[in-house]
Design a protein with these regions (language model features):
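Conserved structural motif at the start of ABC-family nucleotide-binding domains
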Residues: 3-5, 18-20, 72
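Helix-to-loop junction immediately C-terminal to a conserved catalytic motif
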Residues: 49
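Catalytic Walker B motif of ABC-type/P-loop ATPase nucleotide-binding domains
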Residues: 153-157
């Protein structure tokens, strides 16, 4: 399976944010979408998630020798600021999510299977989500997106504000869950992209460029990216 993006364009008034996005993402890989703040990473995600209309180009899935449009339910989108129903307990939230997604989310013998996956402790599973820390809310947001088994998982800087322990847990979870889907992880932190991602893609001046890291040592790789980000910088 491949997600093919062809000549995607998006502008806000006179500001051209996505100039000519042309790239193919492949199943089973984590792509690091690297770019400075304001480069258009969130705009690209909003277009792929069909929250915003594009002004040129298209994107589609290529699988089994054919092509087709991406269905909304095939996309999971994890925001940098977690959005969860704070009036529910964590267990109630999972039950509710499974009820409204019964056709796509398999029912486990116990919800504790899912809590174990993201290392939410037993004493926290029946607490209100409003009492969860930012990191725990982020875990819950990540969990329901993984439960839905989307073909495309968009992660908009989800680890930026997490503490070191939670961030490491989330990185390990993403690596374990990458098979069978296309994962695109946006960040402006170079070391995080290098550590987590299989492929690095640079969003700069409204265009995507794959940066081959296999043939570069760490320092040369950093310098290449920094040089690209400095050119005609905002």
């Amino acid at each position: 399976m491949k997600l093919v993006v062809e000549h995607l364009k998006k502008s806000y008034d006179a500001k051209e944010v996505l100039r000519d996005i042309d790239f193919t993402f492949e199943e089973g890989l984590i792509y690091g979408l690297l770019g400075r703040n304001g480069a258009g990473k969130t705009t690209l995600f909003n277009c792929l998630n069909q929250d915003q209309m594009v002004q040129g180009g298209r994107f589609y899935l290529e699988e089994e020798g054919g092509t087709r449009e991406v269905k909304p339910e095939e996309i999971g989108y994890v925001l940098s600021t977690p959005t969860v129903p704070e009036f529910l307990t964590a267990r109630e939230f999972l039950k509710f999510f499974m009820e409204i997604n019964g056709q796509t989310v398999p029912a486990p013998e116990s919800l504790d299977v899912y809590f174990d996956l993201i290392q939410i402790q037993a004493e926290d599973r029946d607490r209100l989500l409003k009492d969860y820390s930012h990191g725990m809310k982020n875990k819950m947001q990540m969990l329901v997106n993984l439960m839905a088994k989307p073909k495309i998982l968009l992660l908009d800087e989800p680890l930026t504000s997490l503490d070191v322990v939670v961030a490491e847990e989330m990185k390990q979870l993403l690596k374990e869950q990458k098979q069978g889907r296309i994962t695109i992880f946006s960040t402006h932190i170079m070391d995080l992209a290098l550590d987590l991602c299989d492929v690095i893609v640079l969003l700069n001046h409204g265009e995507l460029e794959r940066v081959e890291k296999e043939s570069l040592d760490q320092q040369a790789f950093r310098e290449k990216i920094l040089e690209a980000l400095r050119e005609n910088g905002e």
